[in-house]
Design a protein with these regions (language model features):
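Basic, polyanion-binding surface patches
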Residues: 1-163
């Protein structure tokens, strides 16, 4: 049997994009930092988002049934940290400039790309909920430098200039 700590150690060596997942609706405005996000299909455009069921905002995502995936750029490390912290929801959204698209879920104005989604299906697997999310709107920036998490620290991926 594989121990959870061994699995987490191995997964720390898998480079992942850093995302802030947000929701807004009858249950309020909430968000969290996530790396467990991936494309499922482009027809219809669908993303998979994983969320720990013990997260204090978990019930709010279930009730609102919408979310946005905000892919962070290198300038967003402080936003990632805020949404991964114990700050209350209102304090988290004091970091960054926010707007909305079709669903009303908060969109980070200068994210690399934001996917505005409706949650179509939810599966429970172990400690996490897996949200299957239909993308209904996309906002893309001009930036091309991504914030990546690898080996328990942030890294930069993208355009570099050699002088």
């Amino acid at each position: 049997m594989i121990e959870a700590t061994d699995f987490r150690e191995g997964m720390s060596l898998l480079p992942t994009a850093v995302n802030v997942i947000t929701t807004k609706g009858n249950s309020g405005c909430h968000g969290f930092t996530a790396s467990a996000v991936c494309s499922v299909t482009d027809t219809p455009p669908t993303l998979l988002v994983c969320m720990n069921q013990t997260s204090r905002s978990h019930a709010h995502f279930l009730e609102n049934k919408t979310l946005s995936v905000n892919v962070l750029g290198t300038q967003h490390e402080s936003i990632s940290n805020a949404f991964a912290s114990k700050l209350c929801s209102e304090e988290r959204f004091e970091h960054g400039a926010w707007t909305t698209l079709a669903t009303g879920a908060p969109i980070l104005e200068d994210a690399l790309v934001s996917f505005d989604c409706e949650i179509e299906d939810i599966q429970q697997v172990g400690t996490h909920s897996i949200f299957m999310c239909r993308v209904v709107a996309i906002k893309q920036s001009e930036s091309d430098e991504s914030l990546v998490y690898f080996n328990r620290s942030y890294h930069q991926v993208g355009q570099t200039e050699i002088v």
